[in-house]
């Protein structure tokens, strides 16, 4: 069994919405352009937990790094969340199943953030930061929302995660559970009830 198949610890269903794929030429041109993004604020640090009681499992895949912006323009990479258990969810403001998951993520964050849980919602193809912020405020989202610095970074990050795990990038929501050592230990293609996330998260806290 290949590594891509083995993170079939992957759960999949039809409770997804297809995401449009940007043209590769546009992504390539933005990739070189974004190397010199101006006016970046310093990468922010999140509070870190030093627990190391992560269950050991075979064929874990290292989570790809990323460089994305929060809704205030602060730049984050994956190391900003080092030492925490991360639920990284790719979603869209236009996606019905994604919206249904938000209340469960809010509850999870409230309950487990003090134990080292960080929830990161990467908004894909969801318009400007201002539009996403209005959406976030309306739903009272309390966890970290990240999006493009300039253009296409969010989709490129989605592509990186979909590629290393083999789940693809054609549909949202897609969520990845990352342990304290930075390995992807579970993936979910499609919306899930909160009870599934609670069950799977607990052993890693």
Residue ranges and their predicted role:
Residues 82, 90-107:
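Conserved redox-active cysteine motifs that mediate thiol-disulfide chemistry
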Residues 61-63, 81-83, 114, 170:
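Extracytoplasmic
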Residues 43-78, 150:
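N-terminal "domain-start" segment that seeds a small globular fold
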């Amino acid at each position: 069994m290949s590594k891509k198949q083995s993170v079939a610890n992957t759960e999949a269903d039809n409770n997804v919405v297809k995401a449009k794929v940007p043209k590769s030429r546009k992504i390539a041109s933005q990739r070189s352009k974004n190397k010199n993004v101006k006016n970046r604020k310093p990468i922010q640090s999140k509070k870190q937990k030093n627990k190391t009681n992560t269950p050991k499992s075979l064929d874990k895949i290292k989570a790809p790094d990323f460089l994305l912006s929060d809704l205030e323009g602060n730049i984050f990479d994956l190391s900003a969340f080092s030492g925490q258990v991360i639920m990284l969810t790719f979603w869209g403001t236009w996606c019905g199943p994604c919206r249904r998951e938000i209340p469960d993520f809010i509850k999870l964050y409230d309950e487990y953030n003090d134990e080292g849980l960080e929830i990161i919602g990467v908004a894909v193809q969801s318009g400007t930061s201002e539009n996403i912020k209005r959406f976030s405020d309306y739903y009272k989202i309390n966890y970290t929302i990240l999006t493009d610095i300039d253009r296409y970074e969010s989709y490129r990050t989605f592509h990186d995660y979909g590629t290393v795990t083999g789940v693809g990038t054609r549909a949202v929501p897609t969520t990845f559970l990352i342990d304290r050592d930075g390995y992807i230990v579970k993936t979910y293609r499609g919306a899930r009830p909160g009870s599934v996330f609670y069950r799977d998260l607990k052993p890693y806290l």
